[in-house]
From Swiss-Prot:
<dbReference type="GO" id="GO:0003729">
    <property type="term" value="F:mRNA binding"/>
</dbReference>
<dbReference type="Pfam" id="PF00189">
    <property type="entry name" value="Ribosomal_S3_C"/>
</dbReference>
<dbReference type="InterPro" id="IPR018280">
    <property type="entry name" value="Ribosomal_uS3_CS"/>
</dbReference>
<dbReference type="Pfam" id="PF07650">
    <property type="entry name" value="KH_2"/>
</dbReference>
<dbReference type="InterPro" id="IPR005704">
    <property type="entry name" value="Ribosomal_uS3_bac-typ"/>
</dbReference>
<feature type="region of interest" description="Disordered">
    <location>
        <begin position="212"/>
        <end position="238"/>
    </location>
</feature>
<keyword id="KW-0687">Ribonucleoprotein</keyword>
<dbReference type="InterPro" id="IPR004044">
    <property type="entry name" value="KH_dom_type_2"/>
</dbReference>
<feature type="domain" description="KH type-2">
    <location>
        <begin position="39"/>
        <end position="107"/>
    </location>
</feature>
<dbReference type="GO" id="GO:0003735">
    <property type="term" value="F:structural constituent of ribosome"/>
</dbReference>
<protein>
    <recommendedName>
        <fullName>Small ribosomal subunit protein uS3</fullName>
    </recommendedName>
</protein>
<dbReference type="GO" id="GO:0022627">
    <property type="term" value="C:cytosolic small ribosomal subunit"/>
</dbReference>
<dbReference type="GO" id="GO:0006412">
    <property type="term" value="P:translation"/>
</dbReference>
<dbReference type="InterPro" id="IPR001351">
    <property type="entry name" value="Ribosomal_uS3_C"/>
</dbReference>
<keyword id="KW-0689">Ribosomal protein</keyword>
<keyword id="KW-0694">RNA-binding</keyword>
<dbReference type="InterPro" id="IPR036419">
    <property type="entry name" value="Ribosomal_S3_C_sf"/>
</dbReference>
Length: 238
């Protein structure tokens, strides 16, 4: 099962948590979920050049807190913060709650699956060989500190008449191990021959503690350059 299912969904409440972190009554749930989808889609379109990895949305009482993880925060913030104010005003149109906007810099984009997938897709759109783009992404991730990475590309590769799938892997990528810290993302490259799909899995180590926030905490420590805390057992067995 671990080979087929989305590795992030499989690890929810084990060592991963959701990107939308709020609770709502049944009558409000659909509207709030639609707000989240619209805001995420708008942010990815508006800040396409900023290298947006993920958007976390939290909803404390009568407020909406949006946290954007990006490799190039200066593109979103703009000169003297002018662009971020424009973005805040545009996002406020999607929700009735008071909006708070935070920007978090990703210091090691080579270890972020979403940014790696988008980089490979953009290279293929610029007519770079798909094999060269895959190999470059894999080598950069392993050089920065990934324990394993796998990249899949599917479609009319190289303009071939028949679509096919090719993949490249280095290191270990244990998809069936729940304690494995696996980052996963997809992207698409629009080429003259059609759309080429890109999938990326990055293995960053193991998380032995049972904590849904463990991945985010480990990611923050790695981006700040601090040594990750050593894994601990969840409970001592009797």
């Amino acid at each position: 099962m671990g080979q087929k299912v989305n590795p992030i969904g499989m690890r929810l409440q084990v060592n991963r948590t959701w990107d939308s972190r709020w609770f709502a009554e049944s009558k409000d749930y659909g509207n709030l979920l639609l707000e989240d989808l619209k805001m995420r889609e708008f942010i990815h379109d508006y800040a396409k050049q900023a290298g947006v990895s993920k958007v976390i949305i939290e909803r404390p009482h009568r407020k909406c807190r949006v946290t954007i993880h990006t490799a190039r925060p200066g593109v979103i913030i703009g000169k003297k913060g002018a662009d971020i104010e424009t973005l805040r005003k545009k996002l406020s149109a999607f929700t009735k709650s008071e909006l708070h906007l935070n920007i978090v810099e990703i210091r090691k984009p080579e270890l972020d699956a979403q940014l790696v997938a988008e980089s490979i897709a953009q290279q293929m759109e610029r007519r770079v060989s798909f094999r060269r783009a895959m190999k470059r992404g894999v080598q950069n991730a392993m050089r920065i500190g990934a324990l394993g990475i796998r990249v899949n590309v599917s479609g009319r590769l190289g303009g071939a008449e028949i679509a096919r799938t090719e993949w490249y892997r280095e290191g270990r990528v244990p998809l069936h191990t729940l304690r494995a810290d696996i980052d996963y993302a997809t992207s698409e490259a629009t080429t003259p021959y059609g759309i080429i799909g890109v999938k990326v899995w990055i293995f960053k180590g193991e998380i032995l503690e049972h904590d849904p926030q463990a991945h985010d905490r480990r990611h923050s420590e790695a981006q700040e350059g601090a040594a990750p805390r050593p894994p601990r057992r969840d409970r001592e067995r009797a």
